[in-house]
Swiss-Prot record:
InterPro entries: NGRN/Rrg9. One of its GO terms (cellular component) is mitochondrion. Required for respiratory activity and maintenance and expression of the mitochondrial genome. Belongs to the RRG9 family. It comes from Talaromyces stipitatus (strain ATCC 10500 / CBS 375.48 / QM 6759 / NRRL 1006). Residues 92-116, 264-281 have a biased composition (Basic and acidic residues). It comes from the Eukaryota. Residues 81-141, 250-289 are annotated as: Disordered. This is Required for respiratory growth protein 9, mitochondrial. The keyword Transit peptide applies.
Amino acid sequence: MAVCVASRRLTLLNVIQGLYRTELVSQHAGQSAINTLTVVSSNCWSSKRTFSTSQAYLNGVNEFISDVTTRNTADEDIISELTSTKPGSSSESKKNSKSTSEKSKDRKNKPKEAKKIGIKKSTLPPLNPEKKRRREQWQVQKEALQNKFQEGWHPRKKLPPDSLDTIRHLYATKPDVWTTPVLAEQFKVSPEAIRRILKSKWQPSEEERQRREERWAERYRKIYSHMEELGLRKPKGEWTAKVSDARRLGLEEKPLRQTVRKQPRSDEKQVNISRPDREPAPKGSTSVE
């Protein structure tokens, strides 16, 4: 396994030291050059005698500058090695890019896989199914009514035989006035029901008529007795029987009329009407004065 030498040498301490040295050298080199120039110029103006630095001093300065430059070049080489794009580094970058692309694809595919797993889990029966609660009686009745009347509660209106006869009679006498829509609106049924009634010739039998009359008579008695209990009607007697609708319709038989004999008036109770200013007429005379 190949190990990069530059990466071995690169540590945090070395990098900080290199940066610090470069800053110091740049400052020192600039200051030394400026100082030497200022010193030489000042000496030239102050005295006519020329002074020259010794060879040993110049050699020491040159060695110091060369050492600093070599250190700078070494640091620059390290940085260039790190930042340079070699074939190995390009291959590594390609691998890294491939790995990142694969990771992104995996991340994108994870939600789909999770959804599929969630769907599969939902299709599978639960391990601990919840116990079904016992439904209330009204809930059972409501469900039964909904199943029975899916379109809602719209009961059919059943017309009595009298209404059927009335519809046929009105249409037969005045068909222009009592049309099918008018009859449907009047009797609160559909026009189709009116058409069927007009086409049919159904009539109730005698037994059905008799049962219907008995039912209505019983209903009349119950209503009247209830109103008597509430005090809205007086007890039924002869004076109420005279104006009874049931008697007029023939539901009640008329009682036999009792004949009362008139008693003759007695002479004592006979009243004699006479005028005091006139004399009584003789018994034998029949003339009128």
